[in-house]
């Protein structure tokens, strides 16, 4: 095991023609995150001193999407092969560091596998990640003599005998910086593709008497690349299946693991139940005994113990204390906060609003820029009118207030503790404590009224 510093080169210059997209291939997402970001995260977790990103097509889009300050951007103006890509990055290599080569369209490579590869690299030699396939057609074959790796032959350049070899190159390797620069300088494009192959450094190393150690990944999916949307969708399901399995083994009840998507990180308590077609995005925390109904989307939120989220509810950047109930068909937008035992029912929307302990907003309501006290009843059809076309204003409702149905609260406005708002009221001025506010037009009644008759 070597303890050298290490830098990582990520090849991400390909256009991705078979994706049929204006977006660079490596920016297409897996589990809600760009493929290349998965690789960058692995490199950073591995402790890379520098991450050199070799880019070409769609460079402006890449730079807009990837904000990692640790990235060194390396332009490959012409795509002349993997060896050529590494040659562009070579001036940045330190002689005494390890250089690990990764690919922006191989998103599921694990830190554990890369660490094993790094540990296995012999002094002065190369660590090479390989796999054995039943059908290796199209891949570079690993050639050996007396069990030792001697080189890699690309499929188009291989003889019929070499094409029978099942061990193939994944493209992922690690070597010393000084050695890498020397070997890269010796590459030629004398092959069927007319390209500079990074794989040729294996034969160069062998000719120098250097040892090449092959390591296999834990799972084949770790080294599967993406060239089209079908392959990407398959890797998405592989990834989601792995995440679901981890959650099940950790005690989370997923009613159907095949219909659950995790697009971020999930921290959870005990006895959590998640129904079908639920999507978890960003950083989500679920307390003990949380229940989430079918079709819900939870993003960057904290859900307290004993909360129940009914079907088809969307929760984003929200915070729920214990024993809250939400939905079905509710929407909590950024800044929504529910205190203990609060209830938000169907077709209720909250944004930048706090609902106090035991308070309820049961139906068809919008609460925006609002601070609502404890034990408040918000009647159906209540709207906080928080926007005048230019600025937002706040509504404050004290404890123990009863708001009748079809009420409009025109902010800025304050409703005092214990007040009652009659149904159909438009509140434009502050309401005092324990007062009744009513602004309905007086009802009139005309006896013997006859409806108009349609003219023939």
From Swiss-Prot:
Pfam short name (any one): Hexapep
Region entry Pyrophosphorylase, spans: 1-229
InterPro entries documented for this protein: Bifunctional_GlmU, GlmU-like, GlmU_C_LbH, Hexapep, Hexapep_transf_CS, MobA-like_NTP_Trfase, Nucleotide-diphossugar_trans, Trimer_LpxA-like_sf
Catalytic reactions on record: alpha-D-glucosamine 1-phosphate + acetyl-CoA = N-acetyl-alpha-D-glucosamine 1-phosphate + CoA + H(+); N-acetyl-alpha-D-glucosamine 1-phosphate + UTP + H(+) = UDP-N-acetyl-alpha-D-glucosamine + diphosphate
Top-level lineage group: Bacteria
Residue ranges of the region described as N-acetyltransferase: 251-456
Active site: 363 (proton acceptor)
Cellular location(s): Cytoplasm
Regions crossing the membrane: none
This protein's UniProt keywords: Acyltransferase, Cell shape, Cell wall biogenesis/degradation, Cytoplasm, Magnesium, Metal-binding, Multifunctional enzyme, Nucleotidyltransferase, Peptidoglycan synthesis, Repeat, Transferase
Function description: Catalyzes the last two sequential reactions in the de novo biosynthetic pathway for UDP-N-acetylglucosamine (UDP-GlcNAc). The C-terminal domain catalyzes the transfer of acetyl group from acetyl coenzyme A to glucosamine-1-phosphate (GlcN-1-P) to produce N-acetylglucosamine-1-phosphate (GlcNAc-1-P), which is converted into UDP-GlcNAc by the transfer of uridine 5-monophosphate (from uridine 5-triphosphate), a reaction catalyzed by the N-terminal domain.
Name the UniProt record assigns to this protein: Bifunctional protein GlmU
Organism: Shigella dysenteriae serotype 1 (strain Sd197)
